Amino acid sequence: MIDSLERKDDMKVLMVNGSPHREGCTYTALKEVAGALEKYGIESEIFWVGNGEIAGCIGCGACAKTGEGCFRKDVVNEFVAKAGEADGYIFGSPVHYAAASGALTSFMDRAFYSGGSKMTGKPAAAVV
């Protein structure tokens, strides 16, 4: 299917590595995707969630009210700042006990809520 695509030299895909291992299997899978995108002129960047604690969303709504991101100053705000520049997203995660990594799940909950219109309507995919 990807062979039928035309070149898109002005597109950018922001990929999220949800593994606690910076250059583990999830990174390797995302690098393969990046290589395929590059063949079609699509720029990509891999954003590593990291192996530090990412607290879950508490639903306070402060990020939506202020527009300044989550009050928890961590990698979620860094991602949301980059999210507006991306045309699409790919989320990668190892599978831990039949689910995505806990860090990625908390990350996505907060990123989607605080990212608001920066992410709305843009295509996304998952690599597991």
What are these language model-derived features?
Residues M1-D10:
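Short, Lys/Arg-enriched N-terminal segments with co-localized hydrophobic residues
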Residues M11-I42:
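N-terminal beta1-alpha1 ligand-phosphate binding loop
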Residues T28-K31, G59-A62, A103-F107:
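Short, glycine/charged-enriched secondary-structure capping and boundary segments
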Residues I42-G52:
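A short beta-strand-loop structural module common to alpha/beta enzyme folds
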Residues G52-V80:
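Cysteine-cluster motifs in flexible loop/terminal segments that predominantly coordinate metals
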Residues F71-V128:
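Helix-loop-strand module that forms the ligand-binding subsite of alpha/beta enzymes
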